[in-house]
Amino acid sequence: MEEFNVHKKLSLLIAGAAAGALALSGCSGAGSTGGGDSADNTITALMVGNPQMEDIQKLTADNFTKQTGITVKFTILPENELRDKVTQDVANQGGQYDVATVGAYEVPIWAKNGWLHELSTQSSADTAYDSADLLKPMVQSLTGEDGKMYAAPFYGESSFLMYNKDMFAKAGLTMPEKPTWAQVAQFAQKLDDKKNGVAGICLRGLPGWGELFAPLTTVVNTYGGTWFDKDWNAQVNSPEFKEATNFYVNLVKQYGESGAPQAGFTECLNTFGQGKAAMWYDATSAAGTLEDPNASKVAGKVGYVYAPVNKTEYSGWLWTWAWAMPKTTKKADNAWKFISWATSKDYEQLVGKNLGWSRVPSGKRTSTYSIPEYKDSAKAFADVTLGSIEHANPQNPGVQPRPALGVQFVGIPEFSDLGTKVSQEVSAAIAGSSSVDKALTDGQKLAEDVAKNYK
């Protein structure tokens, strides 16, 4: 992976608004409790509360624990809270967790600071693991400057547009394979039906650099904007950044879901999955849940197309939720056993056979897309998902050169705080208590302060 241009000091806290949900914690429930041997065979895992993580919590006790004798105590948190918790624990060397879900943004930075175990040694030595099968974009995003992998991808994703085929057919509308944002806005206007509780589109409005600004930064990119130009000049109040943000905010205010300022990935998944929105632009990983009839009312009724664009050919983001092992763990062997199991081919088979093939945590292994059962269950979205991942370009996601890697984020330590602070004001603009102009004027000042570290 191309070297990050990072500042030497990491701001230790990721700021962010609370996700508005209570933390859920649980234990795998297997094995005996108490006693030295039991404690030695128990590891702690911190993970984001997405469907794929909820699935692994269900499957661990009856499978991994029975096979290995290792009990896993899970703590599940909403995304913003997860980011705060894991950053505090890892950065402060708290040692509370043996494994944790982290993303493509954190891993290269934390690897540089020596906070994570490298996993290349274990993965290469384990022939059954078949590390060569892992998708290159995902491995590259989790690689440190030394060329070693510091987290194993659990599932990978880009972003695409999901739409309710029944609603489009009823309105006589046809969704193109590569829509523009202008077309999406027209569709949202025609399909918005607030009287019957249906939004034209669902878009994240919840503050957080990895919440609201995940989709919004891709809009900024395709509108010709960027957080910083190649010389580290802040561009937050540039015409392109402002045009993209105004477009996004107005689209949500006019045709978006109710409660948009508090809506993140989870809330939009529920809204769209309940048939309460005509379109949703978000993570490709949402498709598995949407196609599960036990979890979604729109299973079999969803169409999937590439992320909407304006000035670029593609605009999907690139992300992976991955399992990392903090340097502070005293149970590295058991932690690796869990990580290798959770990211293995066998685990994908386990999910497919027990929970349904559409729920396989995909986007990380080439072989996944050759499994007949998965191909059949994922035929509506597999090709667009893989194409979106392959076309995501963290080196050049927009129309101008960038000073650091990242599609929906800037690969520097300060971005977590910067992105979250600006997102809070943009969310306030969606709520009607502030304006885009104020949000970006204030954001420009914050970005200029960050840029001083790199000039």
What are these regions (language model features)?
Residues 39-51, 70-75, 98-99, 150, ...:
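Short, well-ordered beta-strand elements
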Residues 1-44, 66, 437-441, 445-455:
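Short, low-complexity disordered leader/linker segments with a strong preference
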Residues 187-190, 230-262, 303, 307:
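Glycine-centered hinge/linker elements that transmit conformational signals in sensory
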Residues 145-154, 159, 182-234, 268-270, ...:
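Extracytoplasmic/periplasmic solute-binding protein
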Residues 104-158, 212-215, 299-308, 388-397:
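Hinge/lid segment of periplasmic solute-binding proteins
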Residues 63-134, 170-172, 271, 275-280, ...:
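Extracytoplasmic "Venus flytrap"/periplasmic binding protein-like
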